[in-house]
Amino acid sequence: AHRIGIHVKPQGAAVAVGIAHAALDETIEYATDRIVFGKPVAHHQGNAFDLAAAAAGIHGARLVVRDAAAAFDRDEPDAGFWATQAWLETMDAAFVATNVGIQLLGGHGFIADHLAEKRFREARMLALAVGGRDAAELDVSAVVLDIGDPLTAGGRPS
């Protein structure tokens, strides 16, 4: 099951990037249209910072997914490591982006039929697949600490 998981992680990571990106787009649309205290919600400094952090996280996650896909394409021995790294990064990015969406939409973000709530739920469920975050962190830490890697049978990637 563990070996199957390393091939599923890049695909799941790509899905998480899509969820995060959709959540951010929807949040930006709402937050630029909604006026509070005379200006769009998105233009309030704290909210703008949250949107910027979500955007940066999504971009970083997308890059790690590309690295993982390239490692698999080249049949590199550390492809499993990069797949797990991609999994961790994208789960974090999806959580941040969907959480920002729920926060900035206020009460609308908690309505069960609203896209913000749906995206948050999707991101959380996806994060539980393939052993969850703890299993992924255990795999990555084994490589980073050079104590063996259950994913690749190698040490730390160069």
Predicted regions and their residues:
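Alpha-helical interface subdomain recognition
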Residues: 4-158
